[in-house]
Amino acid sequence: MSSQASFDHTPLLRVENITKTFGAVQALRGVSFTLERGEILALVGDNGAGKSTLVKIISGVYPPTSGQIYLNGQLCAFDRPAAALAAGIETVYQNLALIEELDVADNVYLGRETTRGGLVGRFLGILDRPAMRQHTAQALNQLHIKIPAPTLAVRRMSGGQRQAIAIGRALTWGRELLILDEPTAALGVDETEQVLRMIEELRDTRGLTFIVISHNMQNVYRIADKVVVLRQGRHVATLRKEETNVEEIVAYITGARESAF
């Protein structure tokens, strides 16, 4: 874990007793955990454990049925994704939310488009595409994300390249917390290694904070500082990397080991 986290005693994120019901279905049952600045937290659990629901609550897609979320010690009530984005929480979902007909730069700037200067540019809303493409190329290069060109349409790229662009967009704009839902699911071995290294480097050199959802326990154990395990909507364990192993994590996921709470 980055040493930066140890100097700030207020957790970046505190989730307290979050519940969520959909009709008669109780998707989350009193989930609580903290995330320090500069940490990578892996959120793991079997299908239907509540991982995606919890992430959607943190990112403002769903309101919790009950419970509180604190960001930098401040109570937050995100009633829409835009509110979470404004607070600095960026999320990359499995569907990536890329527009295939747009080029790389337009996707990176989606919803944050830059217009040309001057009265005409501002009045007519003319996009400053040269500036957007230049900034996109610089930003992705700094993140060591390799793409053919920022002018290339996303539909012409591989699944791995699309995933890298979606992650790059989140990293470009995220200021507080980056949530990655299965970030390596569509990637080959080399691209997976590239993404894992990028996440580690951004934590270690920039003090960025991540929540990563993944079913790949080897990847989880490699990059995570802390692992939060959900089972059937309940928080059953929080495990520090240096105090656990892959076998123990899997045991909590499957129920072979009882809840630690």
Residue ranges and their predicted role:
Residues 2-261:
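Glycine-rich phosphate-binding loops of nucleotide-dependent enzymes
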